[in-house]
């Protein structure tokens, strides 16, 4: 099995498991929110996993959500260790995904241009 293929499969599996862990979490701070894991990037040595998260709400709420997820990352690492077939579970680093916000902004700009053209 090629290393790139294995890394991609592990990233996909980690994304699936973290999504499951979010769904099963009993924490009231995250259970009522809509949180989406957009992608996972695993380091070459498989020791670190950067998890890109998007959450509903304004900028402050999104930042607080990502900071809180980073604060309780031990829960997610334990969940990965129990469900993933690796020697050691990777350390998780949650990061806000700017891609979704950027695509929404681009769509708003395109809609604005379209409205100006019709007038």
UniProtKB/Swiss-Prot annotation:
Gene3D superfamilies: 3.30.300.20
Keyword Isomerase: no
Pfam families, per database record: RBFA
Primary subcellular site in the record, as a coarse category: cytoplasm
InterPro entries the record matches: KH_dom-like_a/b, RbfA, RbfA_dom_sf, Ribosome-bd_factorA_CS
MF terms in GO: ribosomal small subunit binding
Presence of the UniProt keyword Cytoplasm in the record: yes
Keywords assigned by UniProt, alphabetized: Cytoplasm, Ribosome biogenesis
Compartment annotation: Cytoplasm
GO cellular component assignments: cytosol
Any one of the GO BP annotations: maturation of SSU-rRNA
Assembly and interaction partners: Monomer. Binds 30S ribosomal subunits, but not 50S ribosomal subunits or 70S ribosomes.
Annotated function: One of several proteins that assist in the late maturation steps of the functional core of the 30S ribosomal subunit. Associates with free 30S ribosomal subunits (but not with 30S subunits that are part of 70S ribosomes or polysomes). Required for efficient processing of 16S rRNA. May interact with the 5'-terminal helix region of 16S rRNA.
Sequence similarity: Belongs to the RbfA family.
The protein, known as: Ribosome-binding factor A
């Amino acid at each position: 099995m090629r290393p790139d293929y294995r890394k991609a499969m592990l990233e996909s599996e980690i994304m699936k498991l973290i999504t499951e862990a979010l769904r099963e979490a009993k924490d009231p701070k995250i259970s009522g929110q809509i949180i989406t894991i957009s992608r996972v990037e695993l380091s070459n040595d498989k020791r670190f996993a950067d998890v890109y998260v998007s959450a509903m709400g304004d900028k402050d709420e999104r930042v607080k959500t990502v900071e809180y997820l980073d604060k309780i990352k031990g829960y997610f690492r334990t969940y990965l260790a129990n469900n993933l077939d690796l020697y050691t579970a990777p350390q998780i680093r949650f990061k806000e995904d700017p891609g979704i916000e950027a695509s929404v902004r681009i769509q708003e700009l395109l809609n604005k241009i379209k409205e100006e053209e019709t007038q």
